[in-house]
Design a protein with these regions (language model features):
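STAS-like cytosolic regulatory interaction modules
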Residues: 1-47, 62-159
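Generic recognition of short, well-ordered alpha-helical segments
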Residues: 23-24, 52-55
Length: 159
């Protein structure tokens, strides 16, 4: 869920967050509202996240740093170790506490159709971000990036 109240935005990640469920978050990152001053990401109910989710969170952190966005990850728990393992923990400010979602819900606005091209583009962008954030991720994800890039091109041709 993505919500807002004036210039404050909140994101609640729940369950198992993966390449299929993180596309709206990538879209939010790529269209970060100019009025955003503060962002809270609540991971209290996030059971697990895959590398695509961690890459999209890293995209958000890097975008936030550039735009001087006050950003914090709440209640990361074991997910913090996952971020640390990929060398991107340094991008985040971690806190514990309660987050009460804001009243204006941006996402989900309704049911969205699964889009293979958007999912593939999300996987590609996320893993490219992980590699640029920490070069040691090249060895981990270089093949993923190359295969996904080919998938994206194939999906574009089939349109």
């Amino acid at each position: 869920m993505i919500c807002r109240k004036e210039e404050k935005y909140g994101i609640v990640l729940s369950g198992r967050v993966n390449f299929e469920t993180v596309v709206p978050l990538r879209d939010f990152v790529n269209n970060l509202p100019a009025d955003a001053k503060e962002l809270t990401i609540d991971l209290s109910d996030c059971l697990s996240m895959d590398s695509t989710c961690m890459g999209v969170l890293s995209m958000l952190a890097l975008t936030g740093i550039k735009s001087k966005l006050k950003m914090r990850l709440l209640n990361a728990g074991g997910n913090r170790q996952l971020l640390k393992g990929l060398g991107v923990e340094k991008l985040f400010k971690f806190e514990d506490g309660e987050f009460i979602p804001y009243e204006t819900i941006i996402y989900p606005a309704g049911k969205t159709a699964k889009d293979m091209k958007s999912a593939a583009e999300t996987v590609l962008e996320a893993h490219e971000t992980l590699i640029s954030a920490d070069n040691s991720n090249q060895q981990r994800f270089g093949a993923v990036v190359e295969m996904t890039r080919q998938d994206v091109e194939r999906l574009k041709e089939n349109k």
